[in-house]
Design a protein with these regions (language model features):
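N-terminal secretory signal peptides and thylakoid transit peptides that target proteins
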Residues: 2-19
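Extracytoplasmic/periplasmic solute-binding protein
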Residues: 145-153, 158, 183-229, 235, ...
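Extracytoplasmic "Venus flytrap"
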Residues: 43-61, 81, 156, 205
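Extracytoplasmic "Venus flytrap"/periplasmic binding protein-like
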Residues: 66-134, 143, 165-177, 264-266, ...
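Glycine-centered hinge/linker elements that transmit conformational signals in sensory
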Residues: 185-189, 227-257, 305, 309
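C-terminal lobe and pocket-closing loops
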Residues: 108, 280-300, 313-385
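Hinge/lid segment of periplasmic solute-binding proteins
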Residues: 106-159, 183, 210, 299-308, ...
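Short, solvent-exposed loop/beta-turn-alpha elements that line the ligand-binding surface or hinge
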Residues: 121-134, 202, 218-240, 287-302, ...
Length: 385
């Protein structure tokens, strides 16, 4: 028999395996050792935020997505935009019934667009099962009525980045543990032209990640456990009174107009002493050590530490930002979109991206707590927990 020909039995066996792969997605692909037969020329469009760790977007474009294209036999186009523009893009796409197949979200945004997305529990549960389960926060924001309306992707930790030498000069050899202590040291530093620089503008990340824990630490809340609006309370009023004075005493008052990049630039330029942020400030100082210097000419990276938000009268709180991906209902390639998210979420494919983040993002599952990366740099350890 001609070695280049196959008989009917061989053809049925191979074609059957390929069909099973198409039905079973990534797991089927691995089992059949060939990609599913998606229509020739299929293109998948994906929108994500422009990452604060540029190396991660580069990795996606140049390495991970090209590998996914080969595995899935499809073209994948990635668009990265300012996270503040994502929600308007989602709204326009749903109203026009056309747009990206996959869109990244933050917080609980997907609940606003639930009627316009596909249920993705088949993908999410496979990732969770293989990696120790999702964090409660990641699962909660991605589900509605017990169903996954988005696939959890990551969690960006928020800590206060601060100039350890500047605080030490004012007697704070450890970061303040209460709002009163933070206000006192901040007031001294502002008098020297080194204010706290807190983002408080209408923006997606740092401002809400500061404001909510601050409010909670005073006993305030937007809603109670039954969903009743309870913002108008004595505790909320007390938090506002303190913050008004704290802002004038210790902050760069221009922060009311800052977005999530203004405080990064202010810190790295030596204009502020502290700010709530992801680890992107420190990571950028590592990336360009000779560009970012202290007033003494030393590399900025040597003078940065991270701390949790101070505690208030009702305790200490934190909010870390969960990221997810939605598969859009108007999309014509929903199965392929799910296969891509499963491919990206599997441990062997997610790990290179996780490493490129250098601790800026952690995985949505408990698996990544055990990763050796946390032994690489003690300055990043606060983001592990």
């Amino acid at each position: 028999m001609d070695a280049n020909r196959m008989n009917r039995r061989q053809f049925i066996k191979v074609s059957g395996a390929t069909a099973a792969a198409a039905a079973a997605g990534v797991e089927g692909i691995l089992a059949a050792r060939r990609a599913p037969a998606y229509a020739q020329g299929v293109t998948l469009n994906m929108v994500r935020w422009a990452d604060f760790v540029p190396a991660s977007d580069k990795l996606l474009r140049e390495e991970l997505l090209p590998k996914a294209e080969k595995a899935l036999k499809a073209t994948i186009k990635l668009e990265t935009i300012n996270a503040n523009d994502i929600q308007s893009k989602i709204t326009a796409a749903i109203e026009g019934n056309s747009g990206p197949d996959i869109i990244m979200t933050q917080h609980n945004w997907q609940h606003l667009y639930e009627k316009g997305v596909v249920e993705v529990g088949d993908v999410a549960e496979k990732i969770a099962k293989a990696q120790g389960g999702f964090y409660k926060q990641s699962r909660d924001v991605a589900t509605s009525g017990g169903k996954f309306i988005a696939v959890p992707w990551s969690v960006v930790g928020l800590m206060i980045a601060y100039r350890k030498s500047w605080l030490a000069e004012e007697g704070a050899t450890k970061f303040p543990t209460t709002w009163e202590e933070y206000r006192a040291v901040g007031k001294k530093l502002k008098a020297k032209g080194r204010p706290i620089g807190q983002t408080m503008g209408h923006t997606f990340g740092d401002a809400p990640a500061f404001s909510y824990p601050y409010l909670w630490s005073w006993g305030g809340a937007e809603v109670d456990t039954k969903g009743k609006v309870v913002l108008n309370s004595k505790e909320t009023l007390e938090s506002v009174k303190f913050m008004t004075a704290f802002w004038k005493d210790a902050h760069d008052e221009g922060g009311l107009a800052w977005d999530d990049s203004n405080n990064n630039r202010a810190f790295l330029s030596g204009s502020i002493c502290a700010t709530l942020n992801g680890a992107s400030i420190y990571i950028e100082s590592l990336r360009k050590p000779d560009q970012y210097k202290t007033d003494k000419g030393e590399q900025m990276k040597t003078d940065i530490l991270h701390a949790t938000l101070p505690k208030g009268p009702k305790g200490q709180f934190a909010y870390h930002v969960p990221f997810s991906h939605m598969v859009m209902k108007y999309g014509k390639n929903q199965k392929l979109a799910k296969d891509l998210l499963l491919w990206l979420g599997t441990k062997e494919n997610f790990e290179p991206w996780f490493l490129s983040q250098k601790g800026f993002s952690v995985g949505p599952t408990t698996e990544w707590e055990k990763h050796p990366i946390w032994k690489d740099d003690p300055i990043m350890l606060p983001y592990k927990d």
